[in-house]
Regions:
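Surface-exposed beta-strand-turn/loop segments characteristic
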Residues: 1-2
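Surface-exposed loop/interface segments of Gram-negative outer-membrane beta-barrel transport/assembly proteins
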Residues: 10-98, 112-218
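Alpha-helical support elements that line or immediately flank enzyme active sites
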Residues: 99-106
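A generic beta-sheet turn/junction motif
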Residues: 107-111
Length: 218
C-alpha cells in the first residue's frame, strides 16, 4: 500500500512601496509497502504450484516452527507467497521539500514611462528516499538478511535579476534584462547490509552476524 501526505504554504508581504517579499514551499511525505520481484519474486512459488494445491489453506510453515517454510516448491532460492507476506518487508520512504523565497525592489523613478525591478530569489529542492529490503529469518531456508539503502539529493538555486522598461513613445519600447544564476547540487548514497540473524523474531540489522556499510558523497 501507499500513504502520502502533502503540505503547501505560501505568503507575500509588501514591506514598503518599493519593497516586497514572499515565499512558497511544498512538503511531501510518502511511504510505500511492496513485495519483492525478479529473482526474489513471491510469484515463483505460486506459478509452480498446481491448481489443486491450496496455497491459502495449507499452512505456509511447518507446525510449531514459523521459520521453517512449508511450500509445494522447494524454497532453496524462493520464499512461499504467504510466508513471504508474513515475514518479508520491502519499504520505500520518501521526504521532499521544494520552495523558494524572494526579495524584490521596484521603482518608477517618479515617472510614468520608466520602471525597474530588481529581484533576488533563493530556492531549494531537497529529497531523501530510504529503502528497506528485509528477508525474515527462514528466508530461502537460511537465516535472513536485510539491506538498508537510500539517496539524499539537495539542489540550491540562487538567482538575481534586474529588469528595466522604458516606454520611449507610442511606437518605441525599450526592455532590458540582466541576471546571474548559481546552482549547487549535492548527492549522497548510503547502504548498510546485514546477513544471518542470530535468532528469529527480530529482523533488524543489529541482529545480523555479518554487516557491511558504505557511503558516497558528491
Amino acid at each position: 500500500g501507499m500513504d502520502r501526505y502533502n503540505a503547501k504554504m505560501s505568503a507575500e508581504a509588501q514591506l514598503h512601496k518599493n519593497w516586497s517579499t514572499g515565499f512558497t514551499g511544498t512538503y511531501v511525505n510518502s511511504k510505500i509497502s511492496k513485495q519483492s520481484s525478479a529473482n526474489n519474486g513471491i510469484l515463483a512459488t505460486v506459478y509452480g504450484a498446481p491448481s489443486s494445491y491450496d496455497l491459502a489453506g495449507i499452512p505456509s510453515h511447518v507446525e510449531g516452527d514459523p521459520y521453517t517454510q512449508n511450500t509445494f516448491r522447494s524454497t532453496s532460492g524462493f520464499d512461499g507467497a504467504y510466508w513471504a507476506v508474513d515475514n518479508n518487508e520491502f519499504l520505500e520512504r520518501s521526504q521532499r521539500f521544494f520552495g523558494n523565497t524572494y526579495l524584490k525592489y521596484s521603482t518608477k523613478f517618479n515617472t510614468d514611462n520608466h520602471k525597474l525591478d530588481v529581484k533576488y530569489q533563493l530556492g531549494v529542492d531537497s529529497y531523501t528516499t530510504n529503502y528497506t529490503d528485509s528477508w525474515g529469518y527462514g528466508h530461502a531456508n537460511g537465516y535472513g538478511e536485510i539491506d538498508l539503502y537510500g539517496y539524499s539529493i539537495t539542489e540550491l538555486n540562487s538567482l538575481l535579476t534586474a529588469a528595466y522598461t522604458w516606454n520611449i513613445n507610442e511606437d518605441w519600447l525599450f526592455d532590458a534584462l540582466v541576471g546571474n544564476e548559481l546552482v549547487e547540487n549535492q548527492r549522497k548514497f548510503y547502504e548498510s547490509y546485514g546477513a544471518n540473524y542470530n535468532f528469529p523474531g527480530w529482523n533488524h540489522i543489529d541482529n545480523a552476524t555479518t554487516m557491511v556499510a558504505s557511503e558516497s558523497l558528491r
